[in-house]
Amino acid sequence: MSGAGMVDITAKEPVRREAVASGFISLKRETVKAIREGRVEKGDVISVASVAAVLAVKETPRLIPLTHPIPIEKVEPEVRVRDDGVEVRVRVATTAKTGVEMEALAGVTAALLTVWDMVKSLEKDETGNYPDTVITGVKVEVKRKG
């Protein structure tokens, strides 16, 4: 086969599937304090990042071209502020013919990017760059089938 195409899953049976993905964004201590105290100009970072995760999970086939559009039955974002940044975990579940790890990863990355967007004015240095802001450790922690 040349080019690109979706994997044929027509012969597969729908089964329960679950995935958990996680990631982290390093932030300045002053930024973390502003998040905790609710002083971020754009609003509630935790709530908006959580909603971004849910939206990204549901929109994964529009973001990643060769993923299958599958019914999403459960999305549980967990956004936790730590002293050195924000940790995100997203659990996704469905009953389908293919897994939901890409959906979980999409949720995590969208949440982390949303955090960055919401705090970028606090993270910029005097040159307008982000030397302390780093997204790391994006991974699938769990993938279950059946």
Curated annotation (Swiss-Prot):
<comment type="pathway">
    <text>Cofactor biosynthesis; molybdopterin biosynthesis.</text>
</comment>
<dbReference type="InterPro" id="IPR002820">
    <property type="entry name" value="Mopterin_CF_biosynth-C_dom"/>
</dbReference>
<dbReference type="Pfam" id="PF01967">
    <property type="entry name" value="MoaC"/>
</dbReference>
<comment type="similarity">
    <text>Belongs to the MoaC family.</text>
</comment>
<feature type="binding site">
    <location>
        <begin position="102"/>
        <end position="103"/>
    </location>
    <ligand>
        <name>substrate</name>
    </ligand>
</feature>
<feature type="active site">
    <location>
        <position position="117"/>
    </location>
</feature>
<comment type="subunit">
    <text>Homohexamer; trimer of dimers.</text>
</comment>
<keyword id="KW-0456">Lyase</keyword>
<dbReference type="InterPro" id="IPR023047">
    <property type="entry name" value="Mo_CF_biosynth-C_arc"/>
</dbReference>
<dbReference type="InterPro" id="IPR036522">
    <property type="entry name" value="MoaC_sf"/>
</dbReference>
<dbReference type="InterPro" id="IPR023045">
    <property type="entry name" value="MoaC"/>
</dbReference>
<protein>
    <recommendedName>
        <fullName>Probable cyclic pyranopterin monophosphate synthase</fullName>
        <ecNumber>4.6.1.17</ecNumber>
    </recommendedName>
</protein>
<dbReference type="GO" id="GO:0006777">
    <property type="term" value="P:Mo-molybdopterin cofactor biosynthetic process"/>
</dbReference>
<feature type="binding site">
    <location>
        <begin position="66"/>
        <end position="68"/>
    </location>
    <ligand>
        <name>substrate</name>
    </ligand>
</feature>
<keyword id="KW-0501">Molybdenum cofactor biosynthesis</keyword>
<comment type="function">
    <text>Catalyzes the conversion of (8S)-3',8-cyclo-7,8-dihydroguanosine 5'-triphosphate to cyclic pyranopterin monophosphate (cPMP).</text>
</comment>
<dbReference type="GO" id="GO:0061799">
    <property type="term" value="F:cyclic pyranopterin monophosphate synthase activity"/>
</dbReference>
